[in-house]
UniProtKB/Swiss-Prot annotation:
GO cellular component: cytosol
Main subcellular location: cytoplasm
Function field: A translational regulator that binds mRNA to regulate translation initiation and/or mRNA stability. Usually binds in the 5'-UTR at or near the Shine-Dalgarno sequence preventing ribosome-binding, thus repressing translation. Its main target seems to be the major flagellin gene, while its function is anatagonized by FliW.
Description of how the protein assembles with itself and partners: Homodimer; the beta-strands of each monomer intercalate to form a hydrophobic core, while the alpha-helices form wings that extend away from the core.
InterPro entries referenced in this protein's UniProt entry, alphabetically: CsrA, CsrA_sf
Protein name (database record): Translational regulator CsrA
Gene, per the UniProt record: csrA
Length: 78
């Protein structure tokens, strides 16, 4: 992990297109501003982890789950 020290108003770049600016520091809270290209998605870590875990869980569908879903679908079709 790269550790950098920045003061409010100071920035750093990731590559050529991502600019991170320290906006303020108040106690244990740091506000940052992100300038990123419009086609890039930015997630807070806790949101990213939750979505990742849900996607992994969705991939763990068992044969029994598929059979139950098929039976429900056929039952509704009648």
């Amino acid at each position: 992990m790269l550790i950098l020290t920045r003061r409010p108003g100071e920035s750093l770049y990731l590559g050529d297109t991502i600019k991170i600016t320290v906006l303020s520091v108040q106690g244990k809270q740091i506000k940052i501003g992100l300038d990123v290209p419009g086609d890039m998605t930015v997630y807070r870590e806790e949101v990213y982890m939750r979505v990742r875990d849900q996607n992994r869980q969705a991939l763990e569908t068992s044969d029994a789950d598929l059979l139950a879903a098929t039976q429900l679908w056929h039952a509704k079709k009648k």
